[in-house]
Amino acid sequence: DEQHRFGVGQRLKLAQKGINPHVLVMSATPIPRTLALIIYGDLDISVIDELPLGRQPIKTYIINPAKRHRAFGFIKKHLDLGEQCYIVCPLVEQGDEDLGLEDVRQYAKRLCSEDFAGYSVAVLHGKMKPSEKEKTMRTFAEGKTQLLVATTVIEVGVDVPNASVMLIENAERFGLSQLHQLRGRIGRGSCESTCILVTESELDRLSVIKSTSDGFKIAEEDLKLRGPGDFFGSRQHGLPKLKIANMLNDINLLKLAQNAAASLLYEDPALTMESHDLLKSAVQKLFERADI
């Protein structure tokens, strides 16, 4: 589960637990490499594209930082209705002031004394002790905290149906799949939910998040921007070592190659026929390069 959270080496070790095991991978936000493997025919795909009963689509907006206080007013309106909200920041601590980003703890402290004075606010980040993180998250899940200011530590394993609004600061610093994963922390109940991306740059790139909730379409855009990485190596992004082919523009050719490979392996699964010696040697060299 949450396949995108595992590195290439980790997934390979899991697959080696048995002898040629069947492997089922699940993710709402496939990484570019996964989408590339689907295109290459290494993975079969099943898509569950229906919302669970009672849930509504999440509305997503992109705003300029100048409109942040209007967004805060929108959040307070929902807090006053008894709902809960997230504000997500890219930084855990100070040290990146040159990037114009604010430490999540200082940011939360400022919110408590200014815009959200009188509201119950908590902070959550990855450098907290496990017991502290668990306590903070449990308090939020129980409805005792109204607003949770957090880093991407909330990206996975958080299910609070009463949380209906998420504001993401410096949205341009997150990957598309990561933004989609974060957005999935809201809209888990019956309330209409809203995700607000605060940024003053990369509007074209982020517009795909606004326009779709389809994880595969978002992964496809990520694939165009980041590249799929190595298919047989450990890099999960970057351009593959293809001299002529383009995996996005040559999908029809890839499908022909998939069908030809399937027919060949049906006829000669172990590539033992003399006519396949050269192909077998090339495949072995490819696997040796990747240490498979």
Residue ranges and their predicted role:
Residues 1-207, 217, 267-272:
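Inter-lobe coupling/hinge segments of SF2-like helicase ATPases
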Residues 190, 202-292:
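C-terminal accessory region of SF2 helicases/translocases
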